[in-house]
């Protein structure tokens, strides 16, 4: 029987009970279609995942161990081994929500799109590049179910942060039919340990973000697709500035990062209309000294906003189980 869906799970130093919850949350998929799971152990300190999978005695669950290449490299390994007609990605400490993800898979079977994006703010069905030309795309690969033929040779860049954003942008530049649905059947686990004050890691995040922007700028694409890519780059530059104000370690790092963004012509933010948030941020950050001045206030506002978002997400999740 042909495998309809391959679920790829990159795993790194994950606790067994958390991985168990992730895998258990997928059991319902068999009610709709044949599926498989590929767990890629990305060089964890303890080599237990292969033995754990063997103990499950489930023929559709597979494990691979490799040297550490980051989430992107682990997903690439999963792609190479996957046999499904469609592929999707789930992080090992997250899990699927039965009711809503069941509905998402029914959309997939009914419409048979090249790409399905769930948890979208708007409903859309049409060319993926047209969607990116008009709207903000979801930058998380875990929100997509992708036809293998559509993916083609597209892969993640290993060993970097922000690999999702590069991958999802390039995905929308493929000649593909996109379906977006409002249902969100994916539960993202809030990871307080991932918020680090390590200056070296923060510096690497900014460097990797710039690398992603440069990689996308240098992508050879048809002239008709260029406006969609440029819009996406503008939005990503806006996100870079917000991240800079949230995580920067001082005036020097702020100014150095702005200079780097200026060298690729994305600072100041290009003078275009991408909505009120983009417009206001462009005005507020048009000069480097303005960015330095507003950063302390921006840090507090972003922390408050993120805290409120986490509270709403938690309450919504509890409501689903009432």
Q: What are the residue ranges of the model-derived segments?
A:
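Conserved nucleotide-sugar donor-binding catalytic segment
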Residues: 130-204
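Conserved donor NDP-sugar-binding/catalytic core segment of glycosyltransferases
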Residues: 99-129
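Short aromatic/hydrophobic "clamp" motif used to bind/position activated sugar donors
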Residues: 87
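A conserved acidic beta->alpha catalytic loop
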Residues: 25, 38-51, 91
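Membrane-interface aromatic/basic loop that binds lipid-linked glycans or pyrophosphate carriers
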Residues: 2, 248-322
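Short, well-formed alpha-helical segments that are part of the catalytic scaffolds
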Residues: 14-28
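Glycine-rich, basic loop-to-helix element that forms the pyrophosphate-binding segment
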Residues: 66-82
